[in-house]
Amino acid sequence: MSWMELSLDTTHEAVDWVCTLLAKIKDIDDVRITEYADPNLSQSGERDVAKPSWTFTIRFYLNHQVCSREQVEKIANLLLPLNRTGLATELQISRVNDKPTPDEELNPFVHRIGQRFVILTPDTPYQAKAAGEIPLRLKTTLSFGSGLHPATMLSLQLIERYIVPSMNILDLGSGSGILSIAMAKLGATVLALDNDRTAVQATQDSVYRNNVEQQVTVMEGSLGGGSELGHWMGGDTTENVPKVEATERFDVIVANILARVHIALADDFHRALRRTDTQPGLLITAGFTTDYEQEVVSSLTEAGFETIDCERLNEWVAFAYRLA
């Protein structure tokens, strides 16, 4: 079978943005993200500073037998704004007889976050570089991207800092499942909760792929009043999404969700956390930019939380709180 290979180079900031845009296109068979190989490096290893600094190359494939010129033009037009704003190169199009196997990929996708986490695709060959590394194997999807969204990265940095073995944790808005996997591999027990059926399936797949099914329970549903907010991203939910009651049962809640949901659930977060002699009741929030920072922090402070830590990446921000 022959394929139309469409590719572009993009920045760290825009890699998951590209995936989100491509989710609108039917019939995309496969998405591959690799580390960018810079053709502008001289033999001495110096970069041509006049060239933009790309981080990743994204390749995706359409069956050549059913691919039309109109479909390719639609994809090119969809991605054009990223090219015009300097976030991606112009779309490149070629015909290939076979897609490359994992062993044939140049610069396979390997990305480090914090001191220990290493994000990999399911098939990327990898040998640990240091003791204590924690591999997180994540399938790149158009629904949830690569796991490199700034909010995800900030969450992982705080998770690495605060999660310890034997904690009982709620991952609210689990999405791809990457945060649940990370916490399970740090020794925690996790309830992964999302009100989107696609997210629930993606989380379950990631849990099995990373062999943490004994530590992670995946459910469709929401916490407390979150079940009354509808689909947080505006999509469809099943009727009567199960509700997890906000009673003192979690040592930590991690929520990488929209600002308005953080605000709506502030009191439920407080009720769902428990304080013990060894655990103060922790909340990690992410998924919003500095535009909403003050409103989220104010709502959580009023609900009885104390800010203890913060991580920032460009306009994105994540906070750690404890029960005051």
Task: Describe the role of every protein-language-model region.
Residues 1-66:
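Non-catalytic accessory regions of SAM-dependent methyltransferases
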Residues 18-25, 70-82:
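Short amphipathic alpha-helices in soluble, non-transmembrane regions
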Residues 73-145:
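Non-catalytic substrate-recognition/targeting regions of SAM-dependent transferases
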Residues 142, 146-224:
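Conserved SAM/SAH cofactor-binding pocket of Class I
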Residues 195-324:
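S-adenosylmethionine
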